[in-house]
A protein has these predicted regions:
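Extended, charge-enriched "interface" segments that sit outside catalytic cores
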Residues: 1-81, 85
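Alpha-helix capping/hinge segments and adjacent helical runs
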Residues: 2-5, 10, 17-21, 255, ...
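N-terminal leader/propeptide and maturation segments of large enzyme subunits in energy/redox metabolism
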Residues: 21-60, 149-154, 331, 335-348, ...
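Internal helix-loop-helix
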Residues: 59-60, 90-159, 163, 167, ...
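A short core secondary-structure module
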Residues: 199, 203-244
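A glycine-rich, basic-preceded beta-loop-alpha segment at the flavin cofactor/substrate interface
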Residues: 241-242, 247, 252, 259-291, ...
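C-terminal helix-coil-helix/basic helical segment that borders enzyme active sites and/or dimer interfaces
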Residues: 342-393, 489-503, 522-526
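C-terminal amphipathic alpha-helical interaction region
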Residues: 453, 465-570
Length: 570
């Protein structure tokens, strides 16, 4: 029997070594919930044992049931006729298996029938499901919709929807993109209007809506007449109904198991969720940041699957009387794939930990229970999560695409054929650095935190760990890179040139990532010596890359800004 948790040494290491004690204490309100709910942990050891147990269950479902069904789901997919989407029977069975395991309300409060697990543990589930079938994650992961209602909805909305999500009776969709407005969400035009009784209705179109056949939708709509920017947008809850028409499902390159739909709203009854005018500014940005973490996990899951297929094939395929993994050209590729995969996972769960701490301390603030220290931590983790989330999505999704690409290369011609899984991983990975914000938009989201040095406190904390010998030498290399990073940030700031700033932004974000992830991997090597080779390879490779980019920015070459049309239009 395959178990995608127990067979993943790195994932098990992460759960048992990442510091979640503070996270769980906040999540369980100092374990007071144990007095009221039977499934609430009594202490941290109890919580960790519970996380291990549930992750093992999801790992077994993912490895033993979902993955063997994935080829058929990919080949046949959902069907669409007369405005009705019908999911493949195996997709329906996958969702039933997860529902029966009680993991459809992973992060929801105990009082709504949820598990009240941290984002970090839930993300481990989404990684495993994605490794088994990336398209299923696009349905399973939309339980984030329930979490958004929990954060911003009123008590009546919570009572109406959240228990149904926890029981697996309801599924969700987030309806943001329109035919003319994708990244430019502040310009969406779908109209929300009220009748004389105060009832809201929605009119317009949405496109590229994942699981648009869902029972519950969160919709970004323009509630304020005469507005054209983000301040005129509100968030609404609506339900599947005859007035909400699925016009078609898209014919996609990958993630075939989930329906991506075009929706038409014909006076769809809706409820305002939260406050008017805050739809994009607060609620949808929160929803999208949660989705960006989920897509990062999806990317890591695909990368894990692709790496394993490549490693297995290379260890079995013989050429010139030896297996091809004995050739430097191949084992160097496999090594690079493994280093990048481990790096992406390390950043993913450092990010989710920051998100968990942000959520925990902000909850104290909202409940009026926060001390001055708690309020300071809430502000700190707001800043950290805001920069790590886009950094993480950029890294994980680009790594996933590269690993899927290399997995086909290692397979050679056979990898190009549908007989092998790697061609599906390549197709599925391709969307990850596009939806929920392209890599280019993740750079826009992250660059402010990089310029403001939001990661410096955490870097200082890791740099102070008791490294010795070769580890201390690598730490010093990272610190030297951090000093240069501070120098280059000041250089770009002092130029006061917006075009130059935007031109070098991706380099700056990726340079920051090299440093931060290098420290994460070095930190983990203190807990497991066998991880040291990965940390060393990552730091040495990226030291060279860092210096190359540093020199390029310091050269202040603006020729591309001046002659871009000459090149593009040639």
């Amino acid at each position: 029997m395959a178990n995608f948790f127990k067979d993943n040494k790195d994932l098990c290491f992460t759960l048992n070594n990442i510091d979640l004690e503070e996270v769980v204490r906040l999540r369980e309100e100092n374990y007071e919930f144990a007095k009221e709910f039977d499934n609430a942990p009594a202490d941290f050891a109890d919580a960790l044992d519970n996380y291990n147990r549930v992750l093992s269950v999801v790992g077994e479902i993912s490895g033993d049931r979902i993955e063997p069904r994935s080829r058929t789901v990919d080949a046949e997919g959902p069907h669409f006729a007369d405005g009705v989407v019908t999911y493949h029977p195996l997709t329906v069975q996958n969702l039933k298996d997860l529902t029966d395991a009680g993991v459809m309300g992973v992060m929801l409060d105990h009082k709504f029938g949820g598990l009240n697990f941290p984002v970090t543990v839930y993300t481990m589930m989404t990684e495993m499901v994605s490794r088994a079938d990336a398209s299923l994650q696009n349905i399973f992961g939309l339980q984030d919709i329930a979490e958004t209602i929990n954060f911003f909805g009123n008590d009546e909305q919570k009572e109406k929807y959240l228990p149904g999500f926890a029981r697996g009776e309801l599924d969700g969709a987030m309806d943001l993109t329109e035919p003319d407005y994708g990244s430019d969400l502040q310009s969406v035009r779908l109209r929300a209007w009220q009748d004389e009784n105060g009832q809201w209705y929605l009119n317009g179109m949405k496109r590229f809506i994942t699981n648009g056949c869902a029972k519950v939708h969160l919709v970004l709509a323009r509630s304020e007449e005469g507005t054209t920017d983000g301040r005129g947008l509100s968030m609404f809850i609506c339900e599947a109904c005859p007035q909400l028409v699925v016009r078609r499902i898209e014919d996609k390159l990958g993630i075939h198991g989930v329906a991506t739909t075009e929706l038409q709203y014909n006076d769809v009854p809706a409820q305002l969720c939260g406050r008017r005018r805050m739809g994009l500014i607060r609620y949808v940005m929160s929803l999208m940041n949660g989705a960006r973490v989920a897509i990062s996990a999806q990317a890591v899951g695909i990368a894990e699957a692709a790496y394993r297929e490549a490693r297995k094939y290379a260890s079995e395929r013989k050429q010139f009387k030896q297996t091809i993994d004995q050739f430097p050209a191949i084992y160097s590729m496999l090594s690079e794939m493994k280093v990048k995969l481990t790096a992406a996972r390390a950043l993913l769960y450092e990010t989710t930990r920051a998100v968990d701490l942000r959520n925990g301390y902000n909850a104290l603030v909202e409940q009026g229970k926060a001390t001055a220290e708690d309020k300071a931590k809430a502000k700190y983790y707001d800043k950290v999560a805001a920069v790590l989330t886009p950094m993480c999505k950029a890294l994980a999704t680009e790594v996933s695409n590269q690993i899927a690409y290399d997995a086909i290369q290692i397979h050679g011609g056979t990898g190009y054929m549908r007989d092998f899984n790697v061609e599906r991983f390549y197709r599925d990975a391709r969307i990850t650095n596009i939806y929920e914000g392209t890599t280019q938009l993740q750079v826009v989201a992250a660059i402010g935190g990089v310029m403001q040095r939001a990661n410096d406190a955490r870097i200082d904390e890791m740099a102070a760990l008791p490294f010795e010998g070769r580890m201390a030498e690598l730490r010093d290399k990272l610190l030297a890179m951090r000093t240069r990073q501070q120098e280059i940030v000041q250089f770009v700031t002092d130029k006061k040139d917006v075009a130059f700033h935007d031109l070098v932004a991706r380099n700056l974000v990726e340079m920051e990532t090299y440093i931060f992830v290098g420290f994460l991997l070095l930190r983990d090597s203190l807990k497991s010596e066998e991880r040291f080779a990965i940390a060393e390879r990552y730091i040495l490779d990226n030291e060279l890359e860092y210096n190359k980019r540093f020199d390029r920015i310091m050269a202040a070459d603006v020729k591309l800004i001046d002659n871009k049309r000459d090149i593009i239009d040639y």
